[in-house]
């Protein structure tokens, strides 16, 4: 028996040991524990606003921390900052590359970022002295498309890429300060923990990984999905996260239990998930699907509690405001809708 086979065998044994240890910890299921909790009942949300202005598919959106302004990115080559109260466009930013896949609003409200098939994360300053919006930095370093980006603060941003890595950037210097390697497929999405010390990433290797922002190391790896993970979102308390995948399921993983707690699926749902987001309390999980709908799940009981139907094409992105008062969905039909 060759050395390689021996190592393979050892690796399998270790994997089995880990699986057994996890099983030993799992003394009850989430379903059993939440059995005596009342269901949330039917959740009915109405479209309060429709944001019209993009001329092509919308690929990404992100709320500002004020829960009023949001940024959206479209195949029409524009980044639009919207006032969701009035539906006015605050800024319309022409992009150098129209192949944009992600956008992000800085917590301060001073900057937005975007990127896509140009492999570059472009940072735009919204608060210049002249009043015009301009590129303040172009972060080049990834060797694959930019799939997701999120600001830690005005000078730090985390990106995920089709080159299988994530990166932490110093915006001032334009340099990658940390590279997060470990995925074996395109990284599709990332989500920062509430304290911004950790983040999770979901990738086309069907795994999710938990990373330490400062140390640059992978803390935990979560498996269970049977296809690409397209979307990922932290639970509001930072102890768990949800994923959405092409296998037509969303799943809830717990950091402390080190395993999957719940699967959100239905026999009628056979299409992939593009985006996931929790309500402010974490009781509801909202997920956007390829079949033009957005399903609202009871996160504790895994029952479907409602549907947001109104788009005429794939729901590509969604987000819940920081104050928990509204949901925005963006679609390939070129419209954004605000619901509550």
UniProtKB/Swiss-Prot annotation:
<keyword id="KW-0945">Host-virus interaction</keyword>
<dbReference type="GO" id="GO:0044877">
    <property type="term" value="F:protein-containing complex binding"/>
</dbReference>
<dbReference type="InterPro" id="IPR001680">
    <property type="entry name" value="WD40_rpt"/>
</dbReference>
<dbReference type="InterPro" id="IPR015943">
    <property type="entry name" value="WD40/YVTN_repeat-like_dom_sf"/>
</dbReference>
<dbReference type="GO" id="GO:0030159">
    <property type="term" value="F:signaling receptor complex adaptor activity"/>
</dbReference>
<feature type="repeat" description="WD 4">
    <location>
        <begin position="182"/>
        <end position="223"/>
    </location>
</feature>
<dbReference type="GO" id="GO:0005886">
    <property type="term" value="C:plasma membrane"/>
</dbReference>
<comment type="similarity">
    <text>Belongs to the WD repeat G protein beta family.</text>
</comment>
<dbReference type="GO" id="GO:0060041">
    <property type="term" value="P:retina development in camera-type eye"/>
</dbReference>
<feature type="modified residue" description="Phosphohistidine">
    <location>
        <position position="266"/>
    </location>
</feature>
<keyword id="KW-0853">WD repeat</keyword>
<keyword id="KW-0597">Phosphoprotein</keyword>
<comment type="function">
    <text>Guanine nucleotide-binding proteins (G proteins) are involved as a modulator or transducer in various transmembrane signaling systems. The beta and gamma chains are required for the GTPase activity, for replacement of GDP by GTP, and for G protein-effector interaction.</text>
</comment>
<dbReference type="GO" id="GO:0005829">
    <property type="term" value="C:cytosol"/>
</dbReference>
<feature type="modified residue" description="N-acetylserine">
    <location>
        <position position="2"/>
    </location>
</feature>
<dbReference type="GO" id="GO:0005834">
    <property type="term" value="C:heterotrimeric G-protein complex"/>
</dbReference>
<keyword id="KW-0991">Intellectual disability</keyword>
<dbReference type="Pfam" id="PF25391">
    <property type="entry name" value="WD40_Gbeta"/>
</dbReference>
<dbReference type="GO" id="GO:0050909">
    <property type="term" value="P:sensory perception of taste"/>
</dbReference>
<dbReference type="GO" id="GO:0071380">
    <property type="term" value="P:cellular response to prostaglandin E stimulus"/>
</dbReference>
<comment type="subunit">
    <text>G proteins are composed of 3 units, alpha, beta and gamma. The heterodimer formed by GNB1 and GNG2 interacts with ARHGEF5. The heterodimer formed by GNB1 and GNG2 interacts with GRK2. Forms a complex with GNAO1 and GNG3. Interacts with ARHGEF18 and RASD2. Forms complexes with TAS2R14 and G-proteins; these complexes play a role in the perception of bitterness. Component of the TAS2R14-GNAI1 complex, consisting of TAS2R14, GNAI1, GNB1 and GNG2. Component of the TAS2R14-GNAT3 complex, consisting of TAS2R14, GNAT3, GNB1 and GNG2.</text>
</comment>
<keyword id="KW-0225">Disease variant</keyword>
<dbReference type="GO" id="GO:0007191">
    <property type="term" value="P:adenylate cyclase-activating dopamine receptor signaling pathway"/>
</dbReference>
<dbReference type="GO" id="GO:0007165">
    <property type="term" value="P:signal transduction"/>
</dbReference>
<dbReference type="InterPro" id="IPR019775">
    <property type="entry name" value="WD40_repeat_CS"/>
</dbReference>
<dbReference type="GO" id="GO:0007213">
    <property type="term" value="P:G protein-coupled acetylcholine receptor signaling pathway"/>
</dbReference>
<keyword id="KW-0677">Repeat</keyword>
<dbReference type="GO" id="GO:0007200">
    <property type="term" value="P:phospholipase C-activating G protein-coupled receptor signaling pathway"/>
</dbReference>
<dbReference type="GO" id="GO:0016020">
    <property type="term" value="C:membrane"/>
</dbReference>
<keyword id="KW-0007">Acetylation</keyword>
<dbReference type="GO" id="GO:1903561">
    <property type="term" value="C:extracellular vesicle"/>
</dbReference>
<feature type="repeat" description="WD 7">
    <location>
        <begin position="310"/>
        <end position="340"/>
    </location>
</feature>
<feature type="repeat" description="WD 6">
    <location>
        <begin position="268"/>
        <end position="309"/>
    </location>
</feature>
<feature type="repeat" description="WD 5">
    <location>
        <begin position="224"/>
        <end position="267"/>
    </location>
</feature>
<feature type="repeat" description="WD 3">
    <location>
        <begin position="141"/>
        <end position="181"/>
    </location>
</feature>
<feature type="repeat" description="WD 1">
    <location>
        <begin position="46"/>
        <end position="94"/>
    </location>
</feature>
<dbReference type="GO" id="GO:0007265">
    <property type="term" value="P:Ras protein signal transduction"/>
</dbReference>
<dbReference type="GO" id="GO:0003924">
    <property type="term" value="F:GTPase activity"/>
</dbReference>
<dbReference type="GO" id="GO:0071870">
    <property type="term" value="P:cellular response to catecholamine stimulus"/>
</dbReference>
<dbReference type="GO" id="GO:0045202">
    <property type="term" value="C:synapse"/>
</dbReference>
<protein>
    <recommendedName>
        <fullName>Guanine nucleotide-binding protein G(I)/G(S)/G(T) subunit beta-1</fullName>
    </recommendedName>
</protein>
<feature type="repeat" description="WD 2">
    <location>
        <begin position="95"/>
        <end position="140"/>
    </location>
</feature>
């Amino acid at each position: 028996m060759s050395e390689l086979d021996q190592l393979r065998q050892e690796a399998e044994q270790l994997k089995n040991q880990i699986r057994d240890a996890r099983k030993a910890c799992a003394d009850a299921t989430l379903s059993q524990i939440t059995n005596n909790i009342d269901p949330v009942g039917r959740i009915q949300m109405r479209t309060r606003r429709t944001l019209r202005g993009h001329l092509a598919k919308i690929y990404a959106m992100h709320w500002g921390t004020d829960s009023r302004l949001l940024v959206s990115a479209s195949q029409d080559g524009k980044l639009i900052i919207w006032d969701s109260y009035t539906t006015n466009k605050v800024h319309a930013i022409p992009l150098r590359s129209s192949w944009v896949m992600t956008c992000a609003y800085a917590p301060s409200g001073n900057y937005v970022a975007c990127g896509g098939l140009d492999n570059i994360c472009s940072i735009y300053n919204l608060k210049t002295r002249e009043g015009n919006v301009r590129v303040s930095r172009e972060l080049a370093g990834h060797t694959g498309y930019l799939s997701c980006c999120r600001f830690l603060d005005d000078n730090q941003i985390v990106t995920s890429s089709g080159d299988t890595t994530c990166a932490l950037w110093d915006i001032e210097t334009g340099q990658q300060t940390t590279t997060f390697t470990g995925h074996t497929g395109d990284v599709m999405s990332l989500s920062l923990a509430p304290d911004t010390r950790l983040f999770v990433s979901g990738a086309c290797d069907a795994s999710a990984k938990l990373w330490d922002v400062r140390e640059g190391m992978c803390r935990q790896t979560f498996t269970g999905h049977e296809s690409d993970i397209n979307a990922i979102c932290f639970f509001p308390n930072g102890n768990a996260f949800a994923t959405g995948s092409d296998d037509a399921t969303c799943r809830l993983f717990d950091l402390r239990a080190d395993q999957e707690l719940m699967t959100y699926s239905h026999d009628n749902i056979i299409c992939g998930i593009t985006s996931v987001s929790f309500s402010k309390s974490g009781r509801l999980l909202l997920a956007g699907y390829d079949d033009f709908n957005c399903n609202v799940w009871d996160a504790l009981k895994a029952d479907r509690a409602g549907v947001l139907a109104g788009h005429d094409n794939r729901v590509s992105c969604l987000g819940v405001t920081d104050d928990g008062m509204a949901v925005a969905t963006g679609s390939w039909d070129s419209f954004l809708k605000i619901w509550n």
